[in-house]
């Protein structure tokens, strides 16, 4: 974070009530900057359904903003969230896919709806994401003349466990241009130490887990509310024998091990027949069903317009590991299908599921090119 480049910038800080965004505010204020502070409200549809963690989030954000002499403004993006992110999630789950609502929340809400409501008044939007950026000097032709240009890249955090580039891999180039990650170069332990040293009210607060708006709401209860239940059979893949029953295929994802309620396990979900409403499970001893090494990704979204190279690393879920792979453009009648690739991973990957985002990085797992949806 170059303070010289930020001196004359109007900066909006998105406070969530957590320790990360609170340290973001501290980092900016200690360098003499006066950012605007905002809390985005995206809670459940009815106010009475807000749990204590949602109320606590706002209380924490208010306390931290006041500590540094900033006024906190609450921005209601509840309707946009439920109209866009929830619809995306329910449509995907109903179709038997495995979506990631937090990925779309960043694109559609934090850097989308918020920008439309208040973010457009600011040059930069600062968040507590563990990610970094870098600017590459480029050469480009403008009106027949060679001109200097700049290309901004989304890059990984030095903390592999906390790195959140996978959650940011669907944002647009203009959103990346406005993004500022003041703690992205830090390790989580360092952020905690700063919070404790500065006596922040949430210094010892646990990190949030799961989908950003649910708080303590159970994800299956959330699905049940919008999709209901649809009982069906659980079948052992190898034998075709019915060994149990489920309450709806949308409650289960490929690779899932827990929550099946079956004896004699462990059992893994390896396949879903959406039309017949059948969940297929296996003990995981068949690598051809439990693991995949080659799979297609469609509608690849490039963050800054740069196409990924052949040799890459990737993630299909939020883990510290990056898997080496190669990308092969998918062709149809000798013509490439726009933004579609066949992934050839260097090793079999467990739990590859349709609807997941495959996040693509360079072979040093430093620069993030973007992500595409797996369509196994």
Per-region residue spans from a language model:
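ATP-dependent adenylation/nucleotidyltransferase module used to activate substrates
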Residues: 1-169, 180, 196, 269
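AMP-forming adenylation/ATP pyrophosphatase catalytic core
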Residues: 6, 126-132, 137-140, 149-376
């Amino acid at each position: 974070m170059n303070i010289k480049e930020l001196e004359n910038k109007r900066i909006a800080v998105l406070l969530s009530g957590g320790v990360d965004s609170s340290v973001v505010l501290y980092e900016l204020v200690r360098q003499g900057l006066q950012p605007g502070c905002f809390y985005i409200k995206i809670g459940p549809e009815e106010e009475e359904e807000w749990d204590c963690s949602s109320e606590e989030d706002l209380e924490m954000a208010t306390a931290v903003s006041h500590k540094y002499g900033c006024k906190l403004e609450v921005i209601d993006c509840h309707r946009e969230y439920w109209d866009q992110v929830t619809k995306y999630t329910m449509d995907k789950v109903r179709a038997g896919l495995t979506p990631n609502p937090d990925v779309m929340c960043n694109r559609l809400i934090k850097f989308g709806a918020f920008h439309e409501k208040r973010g457009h008044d600011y040059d930069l939007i600062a968040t507590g994401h563990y990610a970094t950026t870098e600017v590459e000097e480029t050469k480009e032709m403008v009106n027949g003349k060679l001109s200097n240009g700049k290309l901004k890249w989304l890059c990984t955090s030095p903390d592999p466990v906390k790195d959140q580039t996978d959650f940011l891999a669907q944002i647009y180039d203009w959103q990346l241009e406005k993004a500022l990650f003041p703690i992205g170069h830090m390790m989580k332990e360092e952020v905690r130490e700063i919070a404790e040293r500065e006596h922040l009210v949430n210094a010892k607060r646990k990190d949030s887990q799961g989908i950003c708006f649910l708080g303590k709401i159970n994800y299956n209860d959330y699905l049940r509310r919008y999709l209901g239940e649809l009982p069906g059979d659980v079948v052992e893949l190898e034998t075709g024998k019915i060994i149990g029953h489920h309450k709806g295929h949308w409650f289960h994802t490929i690779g899932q091990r827990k929550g099946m309620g079956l004896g004699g396990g462990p059992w893994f979900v390896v396949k879903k027949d959406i039309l017949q409403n059948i969940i297929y499970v296996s003990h995981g001893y068949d690598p051809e069903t439990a693991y995949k090494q080659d799979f297609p990704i469609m509608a690849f979204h490039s963050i800054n317009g740069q196409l990924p190279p052949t040799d890459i690393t990737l993630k299909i879920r939020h883990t510290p590991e990056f898997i080496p792979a190669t990308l092969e453009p998918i062709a149809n009648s000798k013509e490439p299908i726009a933004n579609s690739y066949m992934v050839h991973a260097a090793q079999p990957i467990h739990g590859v599921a349709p609807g997941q985002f495959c996040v693509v990085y360079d072979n040093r797992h430093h620069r993030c090119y973007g992500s595409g949806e797996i369509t196994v």
